[in-house]
Amino acid sequence: MLVRGHHSGKIFPGRRTGSIPGRPILPDAGVSLLELILVLSLFGTLTAIALALVLQSYKGVQLRLSTSTLFDSGTMALNQMTKELRMAGYPSAKAFTSSAVTSYPGLVATPFITVTAYDVVFQSATHQDGIVEQIEYVLAPGSQNLYRYSTHKNLNGSLQASTVQTLLLNNVQNRIIGTPLFTWNTNPSDTQSFPLNVQSVYINMVLQSTSNESGSPASVTLTATCPRINF
């Protein structure tokens, strides 16, 4: 008789019968932690670089704004000084009769009374209204403030008692660094003594702002040539 064998339903140890459904396959925990550290480190580095660039850009903008403000205020003062210095000695005695000059010496403006590296005194009818003023631009020793003093001249040639003081500009560094604010040249053919023979005044204004948010002070140098128009 032929007898057929039957397999039992047992699973023998050591034999693979396939994966068990529903159980996830986890990656190596050590590799994942290393990758996370590298990503965080890279992110931190990029963030630091980005912040540094933003800060540098901000400082650059602040420096440009400070420089622009310094330039604008300096240019305004320089334009006024240039206009008035060009009119030094206006009107001269040539504009009047000799008898008028003798009777009213205050009609005539003396071109330059004092001319030094940091102090210029002159007379002019700057408003062209016939009223002569004695004007002084002075940068005092150790000071960064440039002042303008103005005193009206009486018809008899004397000066009025009241003087108007105006702060033209601060942060002027010429005294601090030893650079002359004013230089000049004279007319060699003029027989008058100095400073009456001064023909032109040159302004060299060095400005520097105080520290700002940029961390660096703004610096500007402005120059002008002021020839006397009625020389």
Role assignments for model-derived ranges:
Residues 1-31:
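N-terminal leader/signal peptides at the extreme start of proteins
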Residues 31-92:
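Aliphatic-rich helix starts adjacent to a transmembrane/signal segment
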Residues 62-63, 69, 85-122:
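Short, glycine/small-hydrophobic-rich surface segments
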Residues 109-189:
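Type IV pilin-like appendage domain
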Residues 153, 208-212, 231:
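Short coil/turn motifs at secondary-structure junctions
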Residues 192, 197-225:
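Short, conserved structural patches
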